[in-house]
Amino acid sequence: MAEVAGFLGSIDLDLQAFPALGNVPLSDGLNERLGLIEGRLQRGSLTDFGHLKGILRRRQLYCRTGFQLEIFPNGTVHGTRQDHSRFGILEFISLAVGLVSIRGVDAGLYLGMNEKGELYGSKKLTAECVFREQFEENWYNTYASTLFKHADTGRYYYVALNKDGSPREGSRTKKHQKLTHFLPRPVEIEKIPQAYRELFQHR
């Protein structure tokens, strides 16, 4: 698996160039590289990647509005107040310094944001599934699209959950809003409900 680590390291420069691209489509070559990463992640089991600390992290994503982010098999994204919910257990894949992709473990889908700022679950790891993870002064993280921002102000689109748990369009978000502030929380196997605990012990 050292090959995978080396491969991820080789794409740092390309990924770091995302913010400067705005709405311009990424090159076919870069999308192809993301596809290769996706393929290698799908072939690998949890134990295969266990030693790659910092590349693959299993977490819940808690929003300051009181909800954990969930990715459902039908591609919808929503928030839940349930701790260790089935669709709220996520894998954070570190692609480069400060750049991550987030995948729902049970749904097998990647968190994506389209040009309208809408969140969705994607079967493929594409450029819309790469986010800039930034540690803020209040100890929370923000997750900004690396592709989409307001053309007039340059303000990025952020992942956000409203006060009712529904996803807010990234085009309607600002960095200082509490609905854009998240805490990645550790996953503890013993806290996962028994009904679906085995799903995560072997993934």
Curated annotation (Swiss-Prot):
Record-annotated disulphide pairs: none
SMART domains attached to this UniProt entry: FGF
Reported phenotype of the disruption mutant: Fishes shown a severe reduction in the size of the pectoral fins.
Top-level lineage group: Eukaryota
Gene Ontology CC terms, in alphabetical order: cytoplasm; extracellular space
UniProt-listed InterPro entries: Fibroblast_GF_fam, IL1/FGF
One GO BP annotation of this record: positive regulation of cell population proliferation
UniProt cross-references to Gene3D superfamilies, sorted A to Z: 2.80.10.50
One Pfam family linked to the record: FGF
Keywords assigned: Growth factor, Secreted
Membership in a protein family: Belongs to the heparin-binding growth factors family.
Its biological purpose: Plays a crucial role in pectoral fin bud outgrowth.
Protein name (record): Fibroblast growth factor 16
Source organism phylogeny: Eukaryota, Metazoa, Chordata, Craniata, Vertebrata
